[in-house]
Amino acid sequence: MSEIFDAKAFLKTVTSQPGVYRMYDAGGTVIYVGKAKDLKKRLSSYFRSNLASRKTEALVAQIQHIDVTVTHTETEALLLEHNYIKLYQPRYNVLLRDDKSYPFIFLSGDTHPRLAMHRGAKHAKGEYFGPFPNGYAVRETLALLQKIFPIRQCENSVYRNRSRPCLQYQIGRCLGPCVAGLVSEEEYAQQVEYVRLFLSGKDDQVLTQLIARMEKASQDLAFEEAARIRDQIQAVRRVTEKQFVSNAGDDLDVIGVAFDAGMACVHVLFIRQGKVLGSRSYFPKVPGGTELGEVVETFVGQFYLQGSQMRTLPGEILLDFNLSDKTLLADSLSELAGRRIHVQTKPRGDRARYLKLARTNAATALITKLSQQSTITQRLTALAAVLKLPAIKRMECFDISHTMGEQTVASCVVFDANGPLRAEYRRYNIAGITPGDDYAAMNQVLRRRYGKAIEESKIPDVILIDGGKGQLAQAKAVFAELDVPWDKHRPLLLGVAKGADRKAGLEILFFEPEGEGFSLPPDSPALHVIQHIRDESHDHAIGGHRKKRAKVKNTSTLETIEGVGPKRRQMLLKYMGGLQGLRNASVEEIAKVPGISQGLAEKIFWSLKH
C-alpha cells in the first residue's frame, strides 16, 4: 500500500451506491478502472491485509489517488466502466487491442438501390447486412452477388451522370438502371428483393420465386427468359450448397477461449441466419497475474459494449465458461439493442458443436501466435546483443518517399516486444524544403516527432534511420539540439544503408556517420528484424506518398482552368466519379453538374482534351 495514499480517510468518504472508480499512480496516470454494485464494499477489498493476487498487490502499491463516479444503476456503471477503459487504456486492465469496426454489406435506399461495403456509423438510408469478419469476405460476397443478381455497385456520382451503359452492363454484371429503357423498374426491384432475401439467409424463398418465374416464362414460350432464369437458379444453388448451415434462423455469436504462457486468445464465430459468416481471433493485452475468468469477463464486456454502435448484436451469445456478470451483461446489451439479447453458457446438443469449433480455433490461433511471439523475441534478443543493449522494448524506424522531389512523405513505424504496433504508425507531410532534399526531410520529421514531451513508455530504445551515413548525420544533429523534458540520450540511433546491388541481406549498419559500417550475416535473426521494420517503414511511406500524389493528380489539371475554383472542382469530381470520369464525359454531361454553365463546360472539356 502506498504511504502517500490514506486509504482509511478515503474509504470514509465513499458511498455504498453503484458506480465506477479510477485509480491513479504518482504520475497522475490512470492505472486501473473498475465498477461496483457497492462502491464502498468493493474499494475496501483492495486494502485488506490478505489480498487475492500478486497483480492486486502490485496495483495497490502504486495507488496515489482514486476518483469515484456514482451511477444510478449497475448497468450504467458497466457501460461507463468500458468507456473509461477505452479512453484511458489502463495498464492493469485487460485490454481489447483490436477495435476495428466490422464491415457490412450496404443496400442503399435509392430509387435504384446499389450494393457496397460499409464500415462505421450507419447514418445512410438503407439496409445493412452483416457483420462480416473482414473486408475480404465482403468483397468476395459482393463479387458473387454481382454475378447472380446484377444490380449496380457504382457510386451515385457515376450513376447519375451516365448517358450510356458501362462495361459492367456489357458483361452482364449490371442491369444498367443508369440508362433509361435498359431494364424495367419491376425487374430491377425484383432483383433487389432477391438480394435482400439472399443476404438475409432466405435462399429457399429466392429459389422458389425463381423457379415459379422460370416455369411461367416457359409456359409463355419466352424460352430465352426461361434460360436466363435457369442459369440464375443454378448459380444460387451452387452457392448455397457450399455453405455450412446450422439450425434454421440461428443468429448468434459463439465465443471460445484459450490461455497459455500469459497470453490469451478469444475466438469469435459469427453465425447469421443459420450460416457461418466467418470468424476472428483476438489477443487481448493481459497484465501479469491475471486469471482467465477476468480475461473472459473483461473481453466480452469491451467487445460488445465499447463497439456497440458499430456492431450488429446477435440474438444470442454462446460462451463455454461461466460469467459472474452474465445477467448484468445480458440486461445491458438488451437495453442497447432495444430487444432481448440472451447470454448462454455451456449449451448442449448441436450448439455445443459450435463451442467446440470456437475452442479449437482459439487454441490453434494461440499456438501460432506464441510461435510468432517466440520468433520476434528471439530476433529482438539477438539485435539487443549486437547493439550491446540490455533489452529492446520499443523501436522506431523512419523512411522518406517522393517522386522527383514532389509530394514528399515521411513515415514512422513502431515495433514493441510483440512486433509491429500498427496503431502507432504515423505519416508526416513534408513542406518548406528544397524538392528532393532527403536530408532536410529527415531533419524535419525527427524534430516534429521528438521535439516535444514523450511518455516514458513511448521513448524508443532504438531509432532506425533508413538511408545510411547522411541521414544518420541529420538524426545526430537533431538530437544534439533537442531541448526536451525526457532523456534524449536513451535512444540508440542506427543508420541502415542498402549494400551492393541493393539486395536484401547485404545491408550496412552505422552507429556513427563517419567511418566504416558493419554487416550482419544474411541468416542473422538480428538482421531479419531490422529488415522487417525497415520494409514496414518503406511500405508505409510509399503508401502515403501514393495517396498524396493521387490527390494532387486529381486536382492539378482542374486548378489551371479559369473559372473552376475549389467548390466547383470538388463538385465536378464528385459528380463525375473522379478525374478519369470527367475526362471521358461529354460537354452536355459536364454541363449537368450544378454550378457549371454550358460555356464553362466547353472550356473544361477542351482543357482536359488538350
Curated annotation (Swiss-Prot):
What GO molecular functions are on record for this protein? Answer: DNA binding; excinuclease ABC activity
Instruction: Say where the protein is mainly found.
Output: cytoplasm
User: Can you name a GO cellular component term?
Assistant: excinuclease repair complex
Q: Which SMART domains match?
A: GIYc, HhH1
Q: Name one GO biological process term.
A: SOS response
Keywords in UniProt for this one?
Cytoplasm, DNA damage, DNA excision, DNA repair, Excision nuclease, SOS response
- Give the UVR domain ranges: 204-239
Q: Name one Pfam family in it.
A: HHH_5
- Report which superkingdom the organism of origin falls in: Bacteria
The name under which this protein is listed is UvrABC system protein C
Q: Which family does it belong to?
A: Belongs to the UvrC family.
Supply the source organism's classification: Bacteria, Pseudomonadati, Pseudomonadota, Gammaproteobacteria, Enterobacterales
Gene3D superfamilies reported for this sequence: 5' to 3' exonuclease, C-terminal subdomain, GIY-YIG endonuclease, UVR domain, UvrC, RNAse H endonuclease domain
InterPro entries recorded for this chain? GIY-YIG_endonuc, GIY-YIG_endonuc_sf, GIY-YIG_UvrC_Cho, Hlx-hairpin-Hlx_DNA-bd_motif, RuvA_2-like, UVR_dom, UVR_dom_sf, UvrABC_protein_C
Location comes to: Cytoplasm
Tell me which NCBIfam families the record gives: PRK00558.1-5 (NF001824), uvrC (TIGR00194)
Q: What does the record note on quaternary structure? A: Interacts with UvrB in an incision complex.
Q: Where is the GIY-YIG domain?
A: 16-94
Task performed by this protein? The UvrABC repair system catalyzes the recognition and processing of DNA lesions. UvrC both incises the 5' and 3' sides of the lesion. The N-terminal half is responsible for the 3' incision and the C-terminal half is responsible for the 5' incision.
Organism this protein belongs to: Salmonella enteritidis PT4 (strain P125109)
